[in-house]
Regions:
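Hydrophobic secretory-pathway targeting helix
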Residues: 1-42
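Extended, hydrophilic extramembrane loops/domains of integral membrane proteins
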Residues: 109-166
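Acidic, Ser/Thr- and proline-rich intrinsically disordered linker/docking segments
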Residues: 261-323
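Membrane-proximal low-complexity regions enriched in glycine and acidic/polar residues
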Residues: 39-125
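Anionic N-terminal interaction surfaces
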Residues: 193-239
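Phosphoinositide-dependent membrane-docking surfaces
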Residues: 54-58, 242, 251-267
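Alpha-helical transmembrane signal-anchor/signal-peptide segments
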Residues: 31-50, 201-211
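Selective detector of the "anchor" transmembrane alpha-helix that sits immediately C-terminal
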Residues: 170-199
């Protein structure tokens, strides 16, 4: 039995929107934690973790290149005794690195170390496979030691089991931020779409009641007296109106329609091909604009709609029908 359901498709849309909004909040909280971590480079133990490094000195120029767009610097991150040293990977002409180099050249870092945020990464040995989400330098330890005098203070106190990556840190930050924004945007879009579906559904019921007073309070007559009624596809042809009630209710007066056809979109997901069916139409007063009616997807939708198209062609000869 058909009933008037003004909130059909509305509540479920809001529930999904709430889910995406909560997910967006979780991703944003991860971004906040990523930006405000307190673990220092000297104490961090896990590759891929965001850390903070205090920089007391830095080489004025890069000591090496990583690929075509990235470079390596050596920095002092501890000033106790002979100090401790490590490598930093960053993009060429990185603004943060330039600021640190400027402070070092002015002699300001020893008394006022620069607090740098980055991702601590363990380098890869040669011929080993990277299984982490982050890009990592191969043969880092051997390369760094090849640059240094093995008896120098820097070489003797150089940390080569880890290095700091600004590139991966910025990439992770951007991913989390854009992810939270995208999810929040999707949630807002779903809320707007849900209210649009409800508004369209209410307008459809009002149009039916206005044109067919006998339906007020008793929509079951749609199914009983319809010339075409398909519960699988959620499609009804009642007198002059074509009605779909999948994901909300939509109605069109076929006397205003110029063309009615089935639009089939073929998609492939995970190697499985499937078809998405939609009824489309154009109006006589707006022949260039295409409107869509949502129907339930069924493999044999084309065959099931032949009867509908035949009835429309017979009763509304001005309407062009097809698939």
């Amino acid at each position: 039995m058909l009933k008037e359901k003004r909130n059909k498709g509305f509540v479920s849309g809001l529930v999904f929107a709430l889910f995406f909004l909560v997910f967006a909040g979780l991703v944003f909280s991860l971004w906040m934690r990523h930006q405000n971590h307190a673990t220092s480079f000297a104490k961090a133990e896990k590759s891929g973790d965001p850390v903070t490094m205090l920089i007391y000195d830095i080489t004025p120029e890069p000591v090496g290149t990583v690929g075509k767009r990235h470079v390596l610097y050596i920095v002092q991150y501890d000033n106790q005794n002979d100090g401790k040293y490590a490598g930093i990977e960053a993009k060429k002409d990185d603004a943060t690195i330039k600021a640190i180099v400027d402070k070092a050249q002015k002699g300001e870092l020893q008394s006022d170390p620069y607090q740098l945020k980055g991702t601590q990464l363990a380098p890869l040995a040669k011929d080993s496979k990277n299984t982490s989400r982050n890009g990592r330098i191969v043969g880092y330890s051997e390369y760094i030691h090849s640059l240094l005098d093995p008896t120098s203070i820097v070489s003797l106190n150089m940390t080569t089991s880890y290095y700091l990556s600004l590139t991966e840190y910025n990439k992770d930050s951007l991913f989390l931020l854009l992810g939270s924004v995208a999810l929040a945007g999707l949630a807002i879009t779903m809320v707007v779409a849900s209210f649009s579906v409800r508004k369209r559904t209410i307008a459809s019921y009002q149009e039916l009641h206005q044109n067919y007073p006998e339906l007020q309070g008793d929509l079951s007559r749609l199914a009983d007296e319809a010339s075409y009624y398909n519960q699988d596809l959620k499609v009804i042809l009642y007198k002059n109106h074509l009605i779909t009630y999948f994901r909300g209710t939509q109605t069109i007066d076929l006397r205003d329609v110029q063309q009615l056809y089935l639009h089939v979109t073929r998609v492939r997901q995970s190697g499985i091909a499937r078809s998405i069916f939609q009824l489309c139409y154009t109006r006589k007063d707006k022949p260039k604009k295409k409107y869509r009616l949502a129907i339930k997807n069924k493999k044999n939708a084309e065959e099931q709609l032949y009867t509908l198209f035949a009835q429309v062609s017979e009763r509304f000869p001005d309407v062009k029908v097809g698939i």
